[in-house]
Amino acid sequence: MIDESAEEFSTLESIQHRVLWLAVRMIDHANNERPNVDGVKVGGHQASSASVVSMMTALFLHHLNGHDRVAVKPHAAPVFHAIQYLMGNLDRSYLTTLRSKGGLQSYPSRTKDPDPVDFSTGSVGLGPAAPLFAAATRRYVDAHFGDRPPARYIAMVGDAELDEGNIWEAIADPATQGLGNVMWVVDFNRQSLDRVVPGVRLEQWTGHFESAGWHVIELKYGKKLRGAFAMPGGDALRSWIDEMSNEQYQSLFGLAPAEVRQRFLENAPEAVHQFFSDMDDHQMADLVKDLGGHDLESLADAFVACDKEGDRPSVVFAYTIKGWGLPMAGNPRNHSALLTPEQIDDFRRAVNLTQEDEWDRFDAGSAEGIVCNERREVLHRPPTSAHLDIEVPSQVGIRSTKPMSTQEAFGRIMVELARDDSLRPYVVTTAPDVATSTNLGGFINKVGVFSPVEKRLWSEDPVMKWSEGPQGQHIELGISEMNLFLLLGQLGLSWDLSGQPLIPIGTVYDPFVLRGLDAFIYSVY
């Protein structure tokens, strides 16, 4: 009997190597072949792209459906474009335009890239948070306008992005709690721009996520290593790997097989030496570098496990190799490194391509071509419209016999809008714990505060009716200007990401506006 699952993942293995080739070659062409008048390095991130090839292959070519939305790690833009090209969503002519005017952008852009980008990324930390607030927006839309087809909101996160404070502000906010359709996949390659990160902060980060109510999966080992752990001596092997410093383990990736044996077994217990005594250098090197973030089946299983968590967000820490599959793998200075022309030639031969067919898609009748075409159909989305067929009043009937502040006028206008039956359903307000002091109180009295579930009001206030339930139209945030602008951006994009146009209005005091502008820019860029 043919194992269809094994056959499918074998095909995906083949596809991911073509994805890696195209991503690396796009960057190589931009730097070495495209006319360059001033001779300045164009740049690109071949190593950072390589580390996410497996997880993006498993996502786009196996796991996602057409309603899902994904934020792609900024430096992985070439991988995204390679996958879109193989699925037929990007014309071949664009592959040689990376980082050129009018061409493929350095980082995914909703407005400037020709292929279907869901979230603009680039300013680290904002990409992961955007899908989180998009999911909060979908929850609001479903409560007010009826359930849409189920959608998952996913972010590919660079591990260094977890140094950004806005990440932790976003996951801790009450407005983002209980979102079971959110999954973050952390590219846990343990390297930053400048260095191999000393130590591993996974325990600290895991604690933060779990404290915020998230489901956490640590995908550290691939199938081969997990199988080895079950063999005699496997416990000693696992303990040795777990106890090894991050710096020592990272140093294995760029070594020849014989050097891997020597470095890995340095000061190792006798039981570990015995475990590898009957294994040649190539087998050993292949085994000890078998990380979960490059095991397509393990990734697919982890994604399914996250889907089963219906009442809380999930994060997968996928251990990867920065520069996976490339000569620069694991090099502490590989962040902006580029393969040499000779290495590109070697890579081309390794993936069985020539200069004549190096940019080709798979043949339509091949197993790989069939998968790519099928996935294009699965992921296809019809266009949506931002148009709202309503008439916005040009003025409201506010009269005053004495001067009033602009803030008071704003509050009175909002109350009048709440009386407009055609306009009111689409208006949603939000504020970072300053709703009443910015004169949203009158509006809130009329429309209520949004909560996924009805909440009992324990203390009656004769002036302010803080009534919380699924039909409320004000979303209250904690004191975080970054969260305010992230949410406003996703509410504004709800016409595309949730199929429902909204009219979002946010309030904050002017000294704090600048703190959130970066998030606002990336919502409209």
Regions found by a protein language model. Give the residues of each.
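Thiamine diphosphate
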Residues: 1-152, 274-293, 297-301, 363-525
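Long, well-ordered, tryptophan-enriched scaffold segments
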Residues: 3, 188-404
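Short beta-strand segments
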Residues: 73, 99, 156-157, 183-187, ...
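Short glycine-/polar-rich loops that comprise or flank the Walker A/P-loop
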Residues: 151, 178-182, 214, 501-502
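A short alpha/beta connector and helix-capping loop motif
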Residues: 164-189, 520-523
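Conserved strand-to-helix beginnings and helix N-cap segments that scaffold or border functional pockets
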Residues: 164-168, 196-199, 516-517
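Anion (oxyanion) recognition and catalysis
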Residues: 175-176, 210, 310, 496, ...
